[in-house]
Amino acid sequence: MPPDYTDGISHNLRGAKMGKMWAGRFKSALDKQADDFNSSFHFDNRMYKQDISGSVMHAKMLGDKKIITEEEKTEIIKGLSGILSDIESGALPLESDAEDIHMFIEEELTKRIGDSGKRLHTARSRNDQVALDIRMYMANECEEIGGLILKLIAAITDKAKENVNTIMPGYTHLQRAQPITFAHHILTYAFMLKRDFERIADAEKRMISQCPIGSCALAGTTYDTDRYFEAEHLGFTDISLNSIDGVSDRDFCLELLSAFSILMMHLSRFSEEIILWSSWEFKFIELDDSYTTGSSIMPQKKNPDMAELVRGKTGRVYGDLMGLLTTLKGLPLAYNKDMQEDKEAIFDAVDTVKQCLTVFAPMITTMKVLPDNMYKAAQKGFINATDLADYLVKKGMPFRTAYKKVGEIVAYCIENGLVLETVPIEKYKELDSLFDSDLYNEISLETCVSKRISAGGTGERSVEAQIAYLTEFLH
């Protein structure tokens, strides 16, 4: 039954909290629905460790600077340590009608130690407090995500080691183009992921280079605080040099969301190929049963749902980035409540990226490669045509002339149901006197691959060098 809003303010205020920390200038309580709308506790409570760590260091600084007494400092730190222990043991559930995690912890602290708890927020605002918490939280998440990326790179590299000589068709425009090895192909994703790792690590360095605590609401504080002490002991390399920027900046969230979006794009591209390769139309690989699902009606189906979900969740992370960009684009300085919306976007992206990476590495490790099917596919589509043109070039023919000549041979093959390897030598010599019987070895798939000696190419030596490079990077 829908709520009845006809009985006015008395109904709207029913159940509303009366004891807000900021309630001094207000004559009546916050509307219950507005209170629920305003609360962020149900999603920002995941930052409890960072909030407590920041508060402990803030209390130490206040005590060292004689802004609070040593006894008050000790009492606050002990109280905060007890709260952390109780949260982690389950004795203090993260279930509350508190406005946010900051108020939850401060209210709990005051409940436990009395007036000393009320002194903790001296020379601090929730504006700089939340900016600190989210930076610390995201720095920790960057480390975890970085570790997951490295595991995926390792899984890809290991799979490449097993398939250095597994020949497959390489594609452009999703048309068979040139012969390559499966190792060479999948190592492409390892190098993409390496850049993702570096982007996230670089963003993390910038994120911890500006500790915002001490910026207060926006203008700084009248107390003789030591911002550098707090920054150093919380793992930052410097403080934010402008207090307004300290509380207004969410560039680090956007930068990470951008890096996560690029990472997800790479995972999506890989997923798309896994989906294609596992289909009967390709059948280059077979995913392990533990990373596939069936159909409710078609008993023969083995669906690559994990890869499809990664592909689908990519748009979700893009949406997190675009949502936060849109939230921030029109905000005047300094802090605005709109900025509360940063957390759900960044938390959702973090959770999604971690889920995708967690499932991806073992999916690759357990994936079965089907080299015979890859080789058979490479025998079709005239993917050795470029090598035939190069054969003529090495015998003195200009490349464009050779290109046209081979194009005519391909057309002849199509008309007569042949492939380049089955055209008789007499026909080749009829088309051009430069052709000789040695061409058949030159256009074999194995030779086409082994001749690719350029750095970064698909030749065995080059692929081994790529594997060695990534192995060293991982260690």
State each model region's role.
Residues I67-I68, L92, K283, P398, ...:
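Conserved hydrophobic residue
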Residues R14, M18-G54, D115-S116, M298-H475:
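Glycine-rich cofactor/substrate-binding loops
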Residues R14-Q210, S215-C216, G220, T225-F229, ...:
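A helix-coil-helix interface module used to build multimeric assemblies
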Residues I134-R135, A139-C142, G146, K161, ...:
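Charged, flexible cofactor/metal-binding loops and thiol motifs
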Residues H58, G79, I83-D86, E108, ...:
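Generic, well-ordered alpha-helical scaffold segments in large soluble proteins
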Residues Y5-K17:
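Short, Lys/Arg-enriched N-terminal segments with co-localized hydrophobic residues
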